[in-house]
């Protein structure tokens, strides 16, 4: 991958087990930023951080951010586009879960 990827996760229902598989895949392909917006975004950010840390023997650094109830998907995308240092200039992918 030329640039580390940036993802905005739109949560429609809060935590679902599929998130674990998604995060594992994103780690595998080198995603460096993950913004979360929608239902229970703060909790999902914590879950993602825990998944990146794992048991602590081989932690993966991924910059994460949760967006409050007053923020839109557009706000989350805008922030992701502005971030470049350490995460690259690549496009922002929006994923709904």
Spell out what each predicted region is.
Residues 1-97:
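ATP-dependent carboxylate-amine ligase
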